[in-house]
């Protein structure tokens, strides 16, 4: 059984923080999950916590919740904020997620790269091997095709772009970016495409961003951030830290207005900062509610290309159906080879060499024609969901 358990949409950030997973514990999580599930993929982003699983035995929904909650040491009171989808609903969920239909900012395509990373990590961890591997391969192809054909780049959107565009409209020209992961890199790229006065990039390893040092970008270590934090108009924070990185005492009470966009989950910025008159603080939930002129265009365009999602769902479900009869197909081919060998051996004992070779080709060709037709019929009936009676007849003909 294939399934996914994750945080429901529109759950408040205060709850999502409690369900966030820490990357440093990833190996431990996977090892423990594989004690209960055949395959596992963990999708853990700043806005999404989802565990995709495949189990060979039928287990109840309560058991699934208990097993996963025990691994992550989550409080049982948080179960009401989680969803569980199985079989086709789980497949549909992944295909829609990778195309941006479930993103807090509709159409945000960063999720495609995040799912690709989760898949690569699962391959590296040896935590997927069959159904989940195929499902993610089809999903990634679906996401790429959707992104290419939908051409969402013509209507750009992300939490980063919305945050920075909002700050620029408010007159911000001096920026600080905290963190240089995927989101941090997007923030820097976006800022460099606009006329800003200066950018302070705060990182834990300055060597990873040394190529950015230039006229308007200054790379600083985290312990240097407070030297300049009160000089900027805007802070964009997007670290993967499990703790607060911008504390209340870091920002002086007096001074010019400072806009802070906290894109992290758990939150990077002390929420008490919003009580200071000079601070305008927005977390990821508030950022996703900022209306932008492209929202309606994105929604209409995505619906127009929804057929790509539906086709990918059907492709995977058909693969599953064919896979269910694959063992029967293998047995039929094995039996075909055995029968051919017996007939060829019998003929060879009676005829000369030249005739024997010709007979071998004829026997094999005739057997292939009938067996391949039987296999085609079996596959066709499997796709219709009526393969059991067909398989029974074919087994009686070829395997008894």
Curated annotation (Swiss-Prot):
SUPFAM superfamilies: Glutamyl tRNA-reductase catalytic, N-terminal domain, NAD(P)-binding Rossmann-fold domains. GO terms for molecular function: glutamyl-tRNA reductase activity; NADP binding. The keyword NADP applies. NADP(+) binds at residues 179-184. The record marks 93 as: Important for activity. Signal peptide: none annotated. It comes from the Bacteria. Keywords: NADP, Oxidoreductase, Porphyrin biosynthesis. The active site is at residue 46. GO terms for biological process: protoporphyrinogen IX biosynthetic process from glutamate. Its EC number is 1.2.1.70. Substrate binds at residues 45-48, 103, 108-110, 114. Pathway: Porphyrin-containing compound metabolism; protoporphyrin-IX biosynthesis; 5-aminolevulinate from L-glutamyl-tRNA(Glu): step 1/2. It catalyses: (S)-4-amino-5-oxopentanoate + tRNA(Glu) + NADP(+) = L-glutamyl-tRNA(Glu) + NADPH + H(+). It holds the Pfam family GlutR_N. The keyword NADP applies. During catalysis, the active site Cys acts as a nucleophile attacking the alpha-carbonyl group of tRNA-bound glutamate with the formation of a thioester intermediate between enzyme and glutamate, and the concomitant release of tRNA(Glu). The thioester intermediate is finally reduced by direct hydride transfer from NADPH, to form the product GSA. Catalyzes the NADPH-dependent reduction of glutamyl-tRNA(Glu) to glutamate 1-semialdehyde (GSA). HAMAP family: Glu_tRNA_reductase. Possesses an unusual extended V-shaped dimeric structure with each monomer consisting of three distinct domains arranged along a curved 'spinal' alpha-helix. The N-terminal catalytic domain specifically recognizes the glutamate moiety of the substrate. The second domain is the NADPH-binding domain, and the third C-terminal domain is responsible for dimerization. PANTHER family: GLUTAMYL-TRNA REDUCTASE. Belongs to the glutamyl-tRNA reductase family. Homodimer. This is Glutamyl-tRNA reductase. The lineage of its organism: Bacteria, Bacillati, Bacillota, Clostridia, Eubacteriales. The gene is hemA.
């Amino acid at each position: 059984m294939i399934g996914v358990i994750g945080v429901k949409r529109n759950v408040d950030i205060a709850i999502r923080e409690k369900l966030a997973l820490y990357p440093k514990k990833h190996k431990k999580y996977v090892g423990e999950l594989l004690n209960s599930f055949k395959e596992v993929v963990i999708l853990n982003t700043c806005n999404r916590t989802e565990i995709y699983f495949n189990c060979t035995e039928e287990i109840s929904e309560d058991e699934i919740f208990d097993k996963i909650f025990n691994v992550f040491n989550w409080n049982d009171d948080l179960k009401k904020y989680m969803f569980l989808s199985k079989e086709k609903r789980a497949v549909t969920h992944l295909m829609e997620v990778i195309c941006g239909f479930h993103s807090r900012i509709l159409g945000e395509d960063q999720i495609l790269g995040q799912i690709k990373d989760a898949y690569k990590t699962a391959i590296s961890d040896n935590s997927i091997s069959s159904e989940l591997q195929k499902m993610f391969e089809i999903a990634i192809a679906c996401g790429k095709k959707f992104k290419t054909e939908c051409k969402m780049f013509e209507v750009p959107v992300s939490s980063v772009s919305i945050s920075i565009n909002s700050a620029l409209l408010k007159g911000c020209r001096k920026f600080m970016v905290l963190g240089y992961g995927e989101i941090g890199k997007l923030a820097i790229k976006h800022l460099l495409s606009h006329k800003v006065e200066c950018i302070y990039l705060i990182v834990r390893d300055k060597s990873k961003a040394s190529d950015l040092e230039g006229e308007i970008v200054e790379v600083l270590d985290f312990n240097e951030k407070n030297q300049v934090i009160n000089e900027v108009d805007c802070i964009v924070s997007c670290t993967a830290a499990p703790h607060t990185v911008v504390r209340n005492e870091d920002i002086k009470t007096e001074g010019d207005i400072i806009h802070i966009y906290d894109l992290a989950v758990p939150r990077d910025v002390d929420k008490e900062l919003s009580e200071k008159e000079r601070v305008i603080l927005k977390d990821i939930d508030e950022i996703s509610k900022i209306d932008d002129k492209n929202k309606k265009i994105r929604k209409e365009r995505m619906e127009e290309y929804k057929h790509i999602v539906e086709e990918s769902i059907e492709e995977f479900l058909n693969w599953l159906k064919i896979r269910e009869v694959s063992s029967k197909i293998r047995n039929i081919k094995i039996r075909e080879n055995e029968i051919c060998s017996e007939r060829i051996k019998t003929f060879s004992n009676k005829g000369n060499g030249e005739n024997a070779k010709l007979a071998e080709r004829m026997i094999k060709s005739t057997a292939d024609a009938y067996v391949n037709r039987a296999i085609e019929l079996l596959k066709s009936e499997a796709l219709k969901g009526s393969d059991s009676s067909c398989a029974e007849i074919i087994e009686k003909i070829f395997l008894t």
